[in-house]
Amino acid sequence: MDIIKQIEQKQMRDDIPDFKTGDSVRVYVKVVEGQRERQQPFEGIVIRKKGSGLRETFTVRRTSFGVGVERTFPVHSPKLGKIEVLRRGKTRRAKLYYLRDLKGKAARVKGIR
């Protein structure tokens, strides 16, 4: 068991900021188009964090042109450029699935003062 932890430790990233559900984040994803590689930002609210260690993932939700879009990212993926925490949110739940049913201003999360 200890060997697995040692191998995973080498692959884990150490530049991940501390964030939790309810926070507004901007995730930069590395996209390859032909010979070029660029970083595509995806901005939204973290509605879920799942797993631990190398298998940890988080889901970000945003509304684009009236349609809800969710993307799930592995935290330690080499495809992620960087993660910026834009705003801290105050929530009482670990999973914010109820935001899927809300529209407009009701789908916002209160910020920490």
Curated annotation (Swiss-Prot):
Q: Which GO terms describe its cellular component?
A: cytosolic large ribosomal subunit
Q: Does the keyword Ribosomal protein apply?
A: yes
**What Pfam families does this protein map onto?**
Ribosomal_L19
Entry keywords, A to Z: Ribonucleoprotein, Ribosomal protein
Q: Which domain of life is it from?
A: Bacteria
Q: Which GO terms describe its biological process?
A: translation
Query: Could you give a GO molecular-function term held by this entry?
Result: structural constituent of ribosome
Report the protein's function: This protein is located at the 30S-50S ribosomal subunit interface and may play a role in the structure and function of the aminoacyl-tRNA binding site.
Family affiliation: Belongs to the bacterial ribosomal protein bL19 family.
Q: Which PANTHER family match?
A: LARGE RIBOSOMAL SUBUNIT PROTEIN BL19M, RIBOSOMAL PROTEIN L19
Name the chain's protein: Large ribosomal subunit protein bL19
Lineage runs: Bacteria, Bacillati, Bacillota, Clostridia, Natranaerobiales
* Gene name of the encoded protein: rplS
